[in-house]
Amino acid sequence: MKRLIVSCGMLAEELKKACAGQSVLPEIIEQPRGMHEHPKELKERLSVLISEHQNVDEIVLTYGLCGYGTVGLISENTRLVLPRFDDCISQLLYRETEGRTCRSKIQAGHLYLTGGWIKDKKSVLGQCREITETYGENAPEILDAIYGGYHTVDVIDTGAHNIEETEKNAEEICRYLPLKKEKITGSCDILKRIISGDYDDNFIVLNPGDAVTEQMFRFNGR
């Protein structure tokens, strides 16, 4: 079977880790990081890529719901596969050793960092620095308006990045924001299944011509 994987650049290191030890690898096309912030553009980009690669048997996206950026996608002549998660953070928080009991383990009031997210142009630390440089003594008030609802910054350790670098980033964030820092264990389990093609209930597998819907991402009806 000829397979194509279209992946978010935010997951580059995790995908590389998932590929380790695999004797046969599918073709992988990496997309720019940060597309989740522009769902309409993401959908347009993915639609074009899907249309341009109808010569394969299966197209697999590492994108989940991503702000509804994948809803409506159709692959006319190939199977289309997506992880049944709202976003990449939800994917990385999932661990097969624990199983899945809810739609997402993301908690209200928590900011999540990975090695990929701290490299984003609009990272939390990048915004804190920019706002402070731009607004000076008024910066704390602006930062509170944006991040006042958060109390914890969680560093996700997937084993794919230099965790010390990510923790240092989190510590710098805590200099700007009154947050406590925690380190939590994530995984590349979903990406490993994407690479191997060994899908379970955490994946949406569509036949040619079927469209992605929001309902497909629900867990136990929610």
List PLM regions with ranges.
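N-terminal basic/disordered segments at the start of proteins
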Residues: M1-Q22
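Gly/Ser/Thr-rich loops at beta-strand to alpha-helix junctions
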Residues: V6-E13, M35-H36, V60-V71, D86-C88, ...
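A short beta-strand-loop structural module common to alpha/beta enzyme folds
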Residues: L25-E41, K183-T185
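Short, well-structured alpha-helical segments in soluble
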Residues: E44-N55
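Extended, charge-rich low-complexity interaction segments
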Residues: V56-V60, G64-V71, Y112-Q127, L206-R222
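Long, charge-dense
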Residues: T78-S123
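Active-site rim beta-loop-alpha module in soluble metabolic enzymes
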Residues: I106-I173
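Extended, basic/helix-rich recognition subdomains
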Residues: D144-R222
